[in-house]
């Protein structure tokens, strides 16, 4: 009953998921676990509410500068990998830093894709370790 009532709340929602849900990284379990649950919930809501016209999609992004991934965290993660901060932020197949604008475009794409549900759009420049399999 509770999740059925949530359908009205989620009619206009998109979920944000991160690569943590697929590739948590060492010592990041407590951070990644809720994201893994959100990935499953996104898929479950697509199954439960698709017949009501409610769409549930996610964006799987990686290494986006934010309140959590700030300059200090970037320096720390780069140092742990013995690379520069620039190499860390561009550490993907395209060797391009993924920006918040790139993620926003993914959300917009899903928002206007009226016949898409249960999808997870990856915006990470190509992080094979975090790809959905």
Regions flagged by a language model, labelled:
Residues 23-29, 51, 95:
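Active-site loop immediately N-terminal to the catalytic Tyr-X3-Lys motif
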Residues 11-18, 55-60, 117, 122-124:
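Structural signature of the Rossmann-like NAD(P)-dependent dehydrogenase/reductase core
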């Amino acid at each position: 009953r509770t999740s059925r009532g949530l359908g009205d709340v989620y009619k206009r929602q998109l979920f944000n998921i991160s690569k943590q849900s697929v590739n948590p990284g060492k010592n990041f379990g407590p951070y990644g676990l809720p994201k893994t649950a959100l990935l499953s919930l996104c898929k479950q809501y697509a199954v439960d509410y698709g017949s009501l016209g409610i769409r549930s999609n996610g964006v799987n992004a990686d290494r986006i500068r934010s309140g959590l991934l700030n300059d200090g965290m970037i320096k720390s993660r780069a140092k742990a990998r013995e690379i520069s901060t620039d190499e860390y932020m561009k550490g993907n197949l395209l060797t391009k830093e993924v920006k918040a604008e790139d993620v926003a475009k993914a959300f917009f794409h899903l928002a206007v894709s009226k016949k898409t549900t249960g999808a997870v759009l990856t915006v990470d420049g190509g992080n094979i370790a975090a790809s959905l399999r």
